[in-house]
């Protein structure tokens, strides 16, 4: 159990790792670059951007680890923070992230509804899941170079793969969309997202349709077919790091016999579902090679 002195030392170390020299604030020129990169036509609101205050767009990049309300720091550090290149922020991007998530879901659902008029609900649901998953949104975020403007603490950047963290990239894209929706409206957001989705160099929708990368579902079907309807079981083996930026180790137990569950694979990830998917993929690969051995 952590002692009081150990906790104090940990908190002091935490304080020393808040300031991040890599942080930069978004400018209007940066915003124009992002919109240019998207490939959309934004000429109708270009004049508005030139005259507007972009502080709300800057909020879209504020990670809570660099926000005053979310961290406990000494009065000395508070005073020191006033001289930082980018001071601690007042508001995080979480509210905009919440909004952007819903806007993206609606835009993609509407897009699929119109594009595939003869397809059933199940087809559209599966394809929407692939288009709004962490992997896809992180890819869009990286393509637009949003990661460059994330304002986060140094300890978070050091701990979670820096600006390549898939979850951070996904959240940043969602919050950027949330701000865009509030400032420019639904139609503008729709054009912005669809310009990215229909960029074949970014996303190949036909490939998403043809290739099933839901390994958990594949493993479930295989288990039902060959193991008398029994379900695989996913369990957490360990968790490393702080709760907000933890790395999870998940395993999958496959019911190779009626009374025998075998830990067939394990994988790590910053998101439990991703680690489960990867462990399912490894298990499927083993099964296809007739390897039903348990891992240590």
Descriptions of predicted regions:
Residues 1-296:
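Double-stranded RNA-binding/processing signature
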């Amino acid at each position: 159990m952590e002692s009081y002195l150990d906790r104090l030392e940990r908190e002091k170390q935490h304080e020393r790792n808040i300031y991040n020299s890599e942080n930069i604030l978004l400018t209007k020129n940066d915003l124009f670059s992002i919109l240019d990169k998207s490939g959309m036509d934004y000429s109708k609101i270009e004049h508005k951007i030139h005259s507007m205050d972009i502080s709300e767009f800057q909020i879209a990049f504020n990670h809570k680890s660099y926000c005053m309300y979310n961290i406990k720091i000494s009065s000395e550090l508070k005073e020191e923070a006033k001289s930082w290149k980018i001071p601690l922020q007042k508001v995080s991007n979480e509210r905009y992230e919440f909004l952007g998530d819903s806007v993206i879901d609606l835009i993609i659902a509407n897009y699929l509804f119109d594009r595939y008029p003869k397809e059933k609900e199940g087809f559209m649901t599966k394809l929407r899941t692939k288009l709004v998953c962490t992997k896809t949104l992180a890819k869009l975020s990286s393509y637009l170079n949003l990661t460059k403007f994330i304002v986060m603490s140094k300890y978070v950047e050091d701990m979670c793969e820096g600006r390549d963290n898939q979850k951070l990239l996904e959240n940043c894209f969602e919050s950027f969309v949330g701000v865009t929706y509030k400032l420019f409206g639904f139609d503008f957001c729709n054009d912005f997202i669809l310009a990215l989705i229909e960029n074949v160099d970014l996303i190949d929708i036909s490939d998403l349709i043809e290739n099933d990368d839901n390994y958990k579902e594949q493993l479930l079907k295989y288990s039902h077919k060959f193991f008398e309807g029994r379900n695989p079981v996913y369990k957490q083996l360990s968790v490393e790091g702080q709760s907000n930026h933890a790395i999870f180790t998940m395993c999958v137990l496959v019911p190779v016999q009626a009374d025998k569950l075998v830990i067939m694979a394990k994988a790590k990830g910053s998101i439990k579902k991703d680690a489960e998917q990867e462990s399912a993929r490894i298990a499927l690969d083993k099964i296809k090679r007739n390897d039903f051995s348990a891992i240590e």
